[in-house]
Amino acid sequence: MKKNEKANISASYNDLIATICNPRISDVGTYRIESVVGEGSFGKVYLAAHLLTNTKVVLKSSCRKQAIILAREIHHHRRLLHPNITRLYEVVCTEDRIYLAMEYCPNGELYDWVAREKRLDEKTTCRIMWQLCCAIQYLHRQGCVHRDLKLENIFLDKAYNVKLGDFGFSRDSDCSRRTFMNTRCGTVAYCAPELVQGHKYIGECVDIWSLGIIMYALLIGRLPFDEDDVSLTEQKIINECPQYPETLSKNSSSLLKSLLCKDYRLRPSIDQIISHPYFKENGYHSSSIRDPRPSSKAEEKVRKRLEFVGVDMDQLNASISQQRCDMFYGWWLLLLEKEMRKENKKKKGLFHLHKGSSSAVHIAPATPSLKTAQVSVMSNNQDSLKSRHTSSDSSNSLLSTFRSWLFDPKQKHTADTLSSSAIRPRTPSPSAENYLTQENFDSDNLSESLDNSVENLTVFPSINSFGRRHSNLPQTTHVDTGEQNTPFTPPLLKTVNLDGNKDFTFPSNSQNSPSKSSNLSINIDIPPSPLQNTVISPQPTRRSRTPIRSLSGRSSVASSRNSSRTRSYSNVSSASSNSLISIISSKPSSSTVQRQTPFHSPFERLHKSFHFPSGEPFNTRINATAIFTVGSGRKNPQSSSSLMFNQSSVKEEEEPEETSFSDSSKHFTDLL
């Protein structure tokens, strides 16, 4: 017995040494690194997951020597909250590295999509350009210009929605003041003529020109000005006009010509672009643009959940108001995004949950005031067994419990749950543990079923038989097969217990019962009344997305990567940016006295015994210094402004004369 104990101690000791000596990074702050998705001279780009919300993010790693360069990007990026702009969640500083946790876009760059497709149809191009114009309009109204718009800096999320990124060249600009700039930056093939000539330029006009280059590449499949020789490319930008194929529609050709006008004074403003007939004929109107700010209801829900798990609300409020990009601010944004997705799905009226080969349950709210919940009805016994087996895994028990606290504050959690070595699956309600332990875990659907208790279950048929509702019967369940309307009592029933008191039953093996592969449309109402009106429709409702065809050929857009380009940056004018530079450029103290790790009392009850799938313990104390800085307040410029400028009324703002162009690095721009 003693020999076995010594052997276990020795093995544990060796594992500890191997973990400490392993040069590979496994965790950065509250993020678990999964893989490397990019690499350049600035550092590596990792795919990671937030440990407490299980949300995938991108970690951009940079050296501390580039703190001044990163300060500009962080300063502008952290205050941009728009559905078509990549989100900056958190900035984690270690002894020698700086990590930026940003939104993950699984479908990569728009450049790669255009290279595969060669060119896009006008309908798809219109949708992409509309989303991109909405992002640019928001950016300009925030008093900021991008100055490096290109296909490589536009990313696509899971649904192929546009996400604008890479704000390394961004600069404060006020449309009402009509500020001139003189720093040469960006990518040559996307640069405006006045910038290439070395003249002073207006940042908004440069962004409009770049929009025209992007639209040209989407419709035609190549860049209008792109040569291997940089000087030849510049000469074409200044002297030549792009060729417009006759296949283009009248409105698209009209918009392209206005965007690629050589005279910046004749280019339209972003508000005029959004009102162009090209978008109106495709069903996009400026009146349909919604306020990107999250609703107060979603914010209140997230605050209550964070307060429930013990977060210091004073510190959280300070992080939000000052946009510190620390651990609390990142946690807040991740949960707020989940809540916003939940509200958007509620507005559509249908929820979809797919679990392998089991029957999916679609829940349609009867009225907006009624609560809704999400239930998974599994007709496959193997799926059920796998789910139970996974939920009993002791390595995930405490993390699952914490997530259920976070997403379901109304759920009662006893002290037995903490002390148990495994979380037992509970059937009375669809809690967070059951969703977390399923094989095909969908974090977007997790929060759909939270904060809801189910008392009354009403099943509605699909659209074809929506008007066929039965009268209220207290004891008999009716099944609508589309052919008959008679009471049906099957001998074999499956039971889904929703609240511990009332069961919903339907036939498991019957000729009149729906097949195992069909989807059921269910509406769950929660008034204080008994079980009523059960109608089952066997008609499947499945979502499908046509995959993008893969082409072996490659567009001439790829040639833009061959030219050599460099970058330069002007001084950061904002006071908050100067403070930011001093923070992230300062090195940790080299004093002999060991600096005590800051401890946050809100996590006292959680930080000792977290365990994850790999078996490695996790301490929720902050293990990396985050940036704390106060963003200076600024007034938003006038929203209605035209870039038809008068030279005599323009105020010039001097910048140090520098010449720099960016290279077309993959996923994130290579900082030189």
UniProtKB/Swiss-Prot annotation:
Residues 31-279 form the Protein kinase domain. Belongs to the protein kinase superfamily. Ser/Thr protein kinase family. It catalyses: L-seryl-[protein] + ATP = O-phospho-L-seryl-[protein] + ADP + H(+); L-threonyl-[protein] + ATP = O-phospho-L-threonyl-[protein] + ADP + H(+). The modification Phosphoserine is found at residue 231. Has a role in meiosis. Residues 508-523, 549-572, 639-649 have a biased composition (Low complexity). Residues 375-396, 416-436, 464-572, 632-672 are annotated as: Disordered. Coiled coil: none annotated. CDD domains: STKc_AMPK-like. One of its GO terms (biological process) is regulation of establishment or maintenance of cell polarity. GO terms for molecular function: ATP binding; protein serine kinase activity; protein serine/threonine kinase activity. The active site is at 148 (proton acceptor). Keywords: ATP-binding, Cytoplasm, Kinase, Meiosis, Nucleotide-binding, Phosphoprotein, Serine/threonine-protein kinase, Transferase. It is found in: Cytoplasm. This is Serine/threonine-protein kinase ppk16. One of its GO terms (cellular component) is cytoplasm. Its EC number is 2.7.11.1. ATP binds at residues 37-45, 60. InterPro entries: Aur-like, Kinase-like_dom_sf, Prot_kinase_dom, Protein_kinase_ATP_BS, Ser/Thr_kinase_AS. The lineage of its organism: Eukaryota, Fungi, Dikarya, Ascomycota, Taphrinomycotina.
